[in-house]
Each structure stands twice: as C-alpha cells, then as structure tokens.
Amino acid sequence: MEIWINPACSKCRSAVQLLDAEGADYTVRRYLEDVPSEDEIRQVLDRLGLEPWDITRTQEAEAKELGVKEWARDASARDQWIKALAEHPKLIQRPIITADDGTAVVGRTDEAVRDALSR
C-alpha cells in the first residue's frame, strides 16, 4: 500500500494518522517532491477507475492559470489533462491510496481510508 500525500494537507495528515492507528503497512510518497510521471498517473487513474479531470484540483491557482475548467472532458483531451497533472502535481487531488488488491481510492474521508485498508 502506498499513499500519495502533501504534508501540508490536513486530509493527508488525517489519512496517515488513521493508517498508523490501524497498524497498516504502507509507504509514503510526497508527490510534490517525488513527482509522478504521466505513465504513473495513467496507472493510478486505472486503479482508481477515474478520469484525470476527476482528480484535478480545479480551484488551485495553477488550474485557473491553465484554464482547465474550459478543457474538454473526453477521450480526446485525456492526454492534455494527464500532462498537466504531471507538470503541475499540486493539481492532483489528495491523498491517493493504492490498495494491496490493485485498486486505489482518493482518501479524503476516514471511510475512504478504511475502504482502502479492507481491500
């Protein structure tokens, strides 16, 4: 199990605290420092069962500068979104937990973190 976090994020800190409280075996990836490649983002999207626009923080200043709210949300624009996430990792929703069964969740609630633990 791996968790992608931004240590400044309260939801990330809460998720890590819950994983620790449950005695989970996991690794931490500080994705703003250890930036995921486009291929890694594609892999995590497959595991999440989501599209890149589903995990994009559209309210971030960088998202507004890029104009992502105006981008198409279909197969033709998928690579554009993934490239933006790789080049601007601050736009990636967090925390993302990759579960041992090959799936992943966006762990913004205790329930989502527990769901990842149960997989």
UniProtKB/Swiss-Prot annotation:
Bridged cysteine pairs (disulfide): C9-C12
Protein name: Uncharacterized protein in glnII region
Pfam families xrefs: ArsC (PF03960)
Family: Belongs to the ArsC family.
PANTHER family: ARSENATE REDUCTASE
Keyword match Oxidoreductase: yes
GO MF annotation list: arsenate reductase (glutaredoxin) activity
Keyword field: Disulfide bond, Oxidoreductase, Redox-active center
